A protein has these predicted regions:
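Conserved C-terminal RecA-like helicase domain
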Residues: 1-4, 77, 113-218, 233, ...
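C-terminal accessory/interaction regions of large nucleic acid-associated machines
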Residues: 243, 311-570
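A short beta-strand element within the Helicase C-terminal
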Residues: 8-10, 218-241, 268-271
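Conserved segment of the helicase C-terminal RecA-like domain
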Residues: 40-43, 246-289
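Long, hydrophobic alpha-helical segments
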Residues: 275-334
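Conserved interdomain linker/interface between the two RecA-like ATPase lobes of SF2 helicase motors
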Residues: 34, 42-151
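SF2 helicase catalytic motif II
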Residues: 2-39
Length: 570
């Protein structure tokens, strides 16, 4: 929608192999490419993907003519200096082996030392690639716990400052193991990092900074660490070896070694289970082609019809850039049914022209939001979808009425962990059951099973605060930020255009941006979070689509705060 004032010469699609993901993520990636090609036909498009053997496939799948103006090249994988080990978790034995049998021989040789132990004793760092489920249920930590004695408590002031910054952001307790205690923070005090897609982006950036500064000893990560982030380790332990995801394996191997900028031969080590040795050898020799057919051009009966409508809109050029919705969706939200619901909803949401607070959100308000979504969707929700949407609407309305991320996490935890009840009745606090909590799941999905994130069959004291934090982020980022905010923004804005009811415009901005303050909206568009806006806004003199001008008082900010805004100075 900003194409009129954008003069773009180059567009780089990094990690472009995402276009091959067999999920909605792959569909969205391809849709961005197609939309960009249409809007910026004179720009040069660059697709970068590691190890891909047929990079020209991106040109074919996006209908880019193969002529003298197009070019593709495969850069062969080069080994940057690594040694390889197998590990037998049952016996604890480590063995050396060669990735090329012709050069190194067919037999593995027992190692006279434990490479993980040696690395940690020498001040090195270890990346363990594991499943998200194993990180969340802590099984992976238990398996490597014998090494944690080699990870002493962090004492560096800069490291402690980063840990406190993270603690404050997620709202975790300090010196209180009964309530709001974060296992992630406790681990971080020993240089043990968790990294996965449900960790909030702000928290992830803190963790990456913590690692880049050399404070990380152990990092337990999922595929979120495969792509792009400059976080090298001395050892990469591939606990989750998936031969079907050979590209992921190659990306991970590239993280072993070069962990410092010192002019030394810092060889990296790669460790796999003994059973994965043959698969690893095959993986390193395997070609990595991507499909020459876009997800947009494939009919998939398994996905919800909403996604098929989205694909059709991209192909037919009927996607509305103003709302990030299809034109068919926009027509749905202009319906008389929605026009009848909105006035009642606005009367409930605003009292004396002020938006209600979080405690005043009623069941009736949430039901109208349900009805609006079902009208947009064009069908009733199944029970499991409705449960997920109910939780999402509650979180969205908390955000709209001024709750920060940590506030929302604490509210959800307080309910599911029965905090008030346990504090009120300390004599039976240990036996009080948890409350049922619905977790994030992608909707629409008519086949979604109906099961909780946290069941009411466990004890309240056993509720894990980190689980609530991660699930809250999934709702805010993957559902509210990525989908619901666009839908409800369009509904309220269209009603405002039709009725001129200022409350509807305010509600549209609350849903989309979490504020109606023009300066704050622009600051959000510039990429600042609400936590950053809180301390930075007084120093903003003016802001619009052209530039952001700061007052001289920015010189009084902390160095860490100045670093955040230095890119805006020229």
């Amino acid at each position: 929608k900003n194409k009129a004032w954008l003069n773009i010469e180059y567009i780089l699609f990094d990690e472009a192999q995402l276009s091959d993901e067999k999920s909605t993520r792959g569909i969205y990636f391809d849709s961005i490419v197609r939309r960009a090609l249409k809007v910026f036909p004179n720009a040069k498009f660059i697709f970068a993907h590691p190890f891909i053997s047929n990079p020209q496939a991106q040109l074919k799948k996006n209908n880019i003519e193969l002529d003298e103006s197009t070019f593709s090249r495969q850069y062969k994988q080069k080994n940057v200096g690594q040694v390889f080990y197998t590990h037998n978790p049952k016996s604890g034995e480590f063995c050396h082996f060669g990735t090329n049998k012709k050069i190194f021989g067919e037999h593995k040789l027992p190692s006279s030392f434990d490479p993980i132990e040696q690395s940690l004793k020498n001040g090195g760092s270890v990346l363990v690639y594991a499943t998200k489920a194993q990180i969340l249920d802590k099984r992976i930590f238990q398996r490597f716990s014998r090494y944690f004695d080699l990870c002493p408590i962090v004492t560096d002031p800069e490291a402690l400052e980063l840990i406190e910054k993270l603690r404050e952001y997620i709202g975790a307790s300090k010196n209180n193991t009964d309530y709001y205690n974060s296992y992630m923070i406790d681990n971080l005090m020993h240089g043990i990092v968790s990294h996965h897609g449900s960790i909030p982006l702000t928290a992830r950036l803190i963790l990456e900074h913590f690692t880049q500064k050399g404070f990380c000893k152990f990092c337990f990560a999922t595929s979120t660490l495969e792509q792009g982030i400059n976080m090298p380790f001395d050892i990469v332990y591939i606990d989750r070896f998936e031969a079907s995801k050979s590209l992921s394996v190659k990306n991970l191997i590239g993280r072993a070694g070069r962990s410092t900028t010192n002019k030394v031969f810092d060889i990296g080590s790669v460790i796999v289970h003994t059973s994965a040795m043959t698969s690893l050898r095959k993986t390193l020799l395997k070609n990595e082609p991507i499909s020459e057919v876009s997800h947009l051009d494939i009919k998939d009966e398994k996905i919800d019809e909403t996604y098929q409508e989205f694909k059709d809109a991209i192909i037919n050029g009927t996607f509305n850039d103003e709302y990030n919705l299809t034109e068919m969706d926009v027509e749905k939200i202009k319906s008389d049914e929605i026009k009848l619901l909105i006035p009642t909803l606005l009367d409930m949401l605003f009292v004396d022209d002020n938006i209600i607070n979080a405690e005043e959100i009623t069941y009736e308000i949430k039901e109208i939001f349900h009805n609006l979504y079902e009208t947009y969707l064009g069908r009733p929700l199944v029970v499991s979808e409705k449960s997920v949407l109910s939780e999402a609407i509650k979180i969205m309305l908390w955000k709209v009425t001024g709750r920060t991320f940590k506030n929302i996490c604490q509210l959800r935890y307080a309910r599911v962990a029965q905090v008030n009840e346990r504090r009120k009745h300390p004599e039976r606090a240990a036996s009080i059951p948890a409350k049922y909590m619905v977790g994030y799941n992608e909707i629409p999905n008519k086949n979604l099973p109906n099961h909780p994130k946290i069941p009411d069959t466990i004890l309240a004291k056993k509720v894990d605060y980190d689980t609530v934090v991660f699930d809250t982020y999934d709702f805010l980022d993957k559902m509210i930020g990525f989908k619901l905010s666009d839908i409800y923004y369009a509904i309220f804005r269209e009603y405002y255009l039709d009725s001129n009811d200022e409350r509807s415009l305010r509600m549209a901005n609350y849903v989309k941006f979490g504020t109606t303050d023009t300066t704050e909206i622009w600051m959000l568009k510039y990429g600042f979070t609400f936590e950053e806006i809180e301390w930075l806004k007084p120093h903003v003199k003016s802001i619009d689509e052209q530039e952001i001008c700061f007052r001289n008082s920015v010189n009084e900010l902390k160095d860490s705060q100045k670093e955040l805004i230095e890119k805006f100075f020229y």
